[in-house]
Design a protein with these regions (language model features):
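N-terminal small/polar loop signature for handling phosphorylated ligands or for N-terminal nucleophile
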Residues: 1-26, 126-140
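Active-site segments that bind and position negatively charged phosphate/pyrophosphate groups
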Residues: 103-216
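Structural motif
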Residues: 1-3, 24-26, 62-64, 192-195
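Generic secondary-structure signature for well-ordered alpha-helical cores
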Residues: 49, 69-73, 88-96, 118-129, ...
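A glycine/threonine-rich phosphate-anchoring loop and its flanking beta-alpha core
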Residues: 19-113
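C-terminal charged capping/lid subdomain of soluble metabolic enzymes
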Residues: 207-277
Length: 277
């Protein structure tokens, strides 16, 4: 058997090894930054740190040992970023499934994805405060479980035939585009950038209500709300947008995401940010 102990990349490495060696994997997440401990996919990277491809397995880890008394003493930035990656699951899966009649298990996953969003709005801010104080509160536990368990269950249910279609979207496409800049890849966390990408997704989708909710939530906990927060300038935008629209993450979308849509979304985000300083 193989024990996958650590964060997302360590866990994904051990899971991939388990798949290749045909050994059962048991996971022990030490941070709450993603759902790697419970899901049946590993994210593979190139040697320069850029995204390569997802590597799917037949089964998730046999068991995940989640010890909140350990996780509470890890750096808060990991759960902070994990929150952004988790609420993305709701928006990306529901938009991907819009106007479709998916098979039951996919529909179940899309329906469950709401639990990747609403509990974090309720508990996320206090959970971060409690972690800073070393307190394993109800809010902290609910946030940890949303990040590690709920998101993984949704991920497994909405992944059909080892294709990522319902399992990703514009938020992740923006993340992969941003991390093509070495200083961003090295200086920012996955969920932090995905959370920023969700703001753009909501603007492209003309979902003003949820945009305002997510913007205010991001602002309240320090997740990115503008270009400066992710260290890009107006001069970088063309490259970011070009890369974003080339990502397969937006292939399964109810409409084509164009460069013009993204340009307008970036403009709207900056204008909204300037008016809410």
């Amino acid at each position: 058997m193989i024990f996958a102990i650590g964060g997302g990349k360590a866990t994904d490495t051990a899971k991939a090894l388990g798949e290749m060696a045909k050994k059962p994997v048991f996971s022990v997440p030490t941070i709450a930054s993603n759902c790697a401990a419970c899901t049946s996919v590993s994210i593979m990277y190139n040697e320069d740190g850029s995204f390569k491809n997802p590597f799917f397995f037949e089964k998730p880890p046999v068991h995940a040992f989640i010890q909140t008394s350990v996780i509470v003493h890890t750096p808060t930035k990991y759960m902070w970023a994990g929150i952004g990656d988790t609420y993305a699951k709701y928006f990306e899966s529901t938009i991907s499934a819009r106007g479709e009649n998916p098979v039951h298990y996919v529909a179940l996953g899309v329906g469950m994805s709401r639990l990747c969003y609403e509990p974090l709005l309720l508990y996320g801010k206090k959970a971060l405060e409690d972690q800073k104080n070393g307190v394993v509160s109800y809010e902290f536990e609910q946030t940890v479980l949303s990040i590690i368990v709920t998101t993984a269950i949704v991920s497994i249910l909405v992944t059909t035939e080892h294709i990522i279609d319902y399992n990703t979207g514009l938020g992740h496409a923006v993340y992969y585009a941003l991390t093509s800049f070495p200083h961003i890849e090295e200086g920012h966390l996955h969920g932090e950038l995905v959370g920023f990408g969700i703001l753009l997704l909501l603007l492209v989708d003309h979902d003003e209500e949820n945009f305002r909710k997510v913007y205010e939530f991001n602002k309240s906990i320090g997740l990115p709300t503008c270009l400066a927060d992710v260290e890009i300038t107006a001069a970088d935008l063309d490259a970011v947008i070009e890369k974003t629209v080339s990502m397969k993450d937006i292939d399964h979308n109810p409409y084509v995401v164009t460069k013009e849509m993204l340009t307008e979304a970036f403009r709207e985000l900056e204008a909204y940010h300037e008016s809410h300083l």
